[in-house]
């Protein structure tokens, strides 16, 4: 008996560095988990000691607040949610539970859509980049150097940078999606196609042999009345 799984023909089971999509998804989930854990630690330390991350109006070059307590709490909640989503994706890929990967995949789609909107905004409104740079504080690193660049060249550089990011994010999305399909296909027993041979065919004797053997039997003894 030979089993053929059709879901193995329509997509690749390998990603970068020739590793399996499950391994790639686990590594990606752990990487996002570490990043969000570091961000959460920074936010918690900033919330515990506001003076350590406090910037005065002279340092910022304007009369606005860097981050208040409400925004800090929102950022902490988002970091906790991201840690939960990344942990679910890592656990789902490790334990081969496809449903646990869906939240992380939805986050990837949402992040890709936001970056696409940024690229469209830069392409449609190229002057918005110069306006955004002018609003930065005067002591912002490399502000004057960026302002001195030709606006057209600056737009092209930013679009090229965003295109590279979108390509990389799209590749990561495909890796996670292939991992979901792989796990979902392995857990579905009804998608397997069973290929069998004729080894179980029942061979019946020829009709002539059956009738001859039946006729050759001795007749029953005669009936004797009492």
From Swiss-Prot:
UniProt KW keywords: Cell membrane, Cell projection, Endosome, Lysosome, Membrane, Transmembrane, Transmembrane helix, Transport, Ubl conjugation
Membrane-crossing segments per the record: 26-46, 72-92, 100-120, 153-173
Subcellular location: Endomembrane system; Late endosome membrane; Cell membrane; Cell projection
Cellular component terms per the entry's GO annotation: cell projection; early endosome; endosome; late endosome membrane; lysosomal membrane; lysosome; multivesicular body membrane; multivesicular body, internal vesicle
GO molecular function, one term: phosphatidylinositol bisphosphate binding
Region listing for Required for NEDD4 interaction, in residue ranges: 205-221
BP GO annotations: endosome organization; endosome transport via multivesicular body sorting pathway; negative regulation of lysosomal protein catabolic process; negative regulation of transforming growth factor beta1 production; regulation of lysosomal membrane permeability; regulation of lysosome organization
PTM remark: Undergoes proteolytic cleavage following delivery to the lysosomes.
Superkingdom as given in the UniProt entry: Eukaryota
Pfam families associated with the record: Mtp
Membrane-protein topology: Multi-pass membrane protein
Coiled coil: none
Major location (coarse): membrane
Subunit structure: Homooligomer; upon reaching the lysosomes. Interacts with MCOLN1. Interacts with NEDD4; may play a role in the lysosomal sorting of LAPTM4B; enhances HGS association with NEDD4; mediates inhibition of EGFR degradation. Interacts with PIP5K1C; promotes SNX5 association with LAPTM4B; kinase activity of PIP5K1C is required; interaction is regulated by phosphatidylinositol 4,5-bisphosphate generated by PIP5K1C. Interacts with HGS; promotes HGS ubiquitination. Interacts with SNX5.
Function: Required for optimal lysosomal function. Blocks EGF-stimulated EGFR intraluminal sorting and degradation. Conversely by binding with the phosphatidylinositol 4,5-bisphosphate, regulates its PIP5K1C interaction, inhibits HGS ubiquitination and relieves LAPTM4B inhibition of EGFR degradation. Recruits SLC3A2 and SLC7A5 (the Leu transporter) to the lysosome, promoting entry of leucine and other essential amino acid (EAA) into the lysosome, stimulating activation of proton-transporting vacuolar (V)-ATPase protein pump (V-ATPase) and hence mTORC1 activation.
Family, per entry: Belongs to the LAPTM4/LAPTM5 transporter family.
Name of the protein: Lysosomal-associated transmembrane protein 4B
Protein species of origin: Macaca fascicularis
Gene name, Swiss-Prot/TrEMBL: LAPTM4B
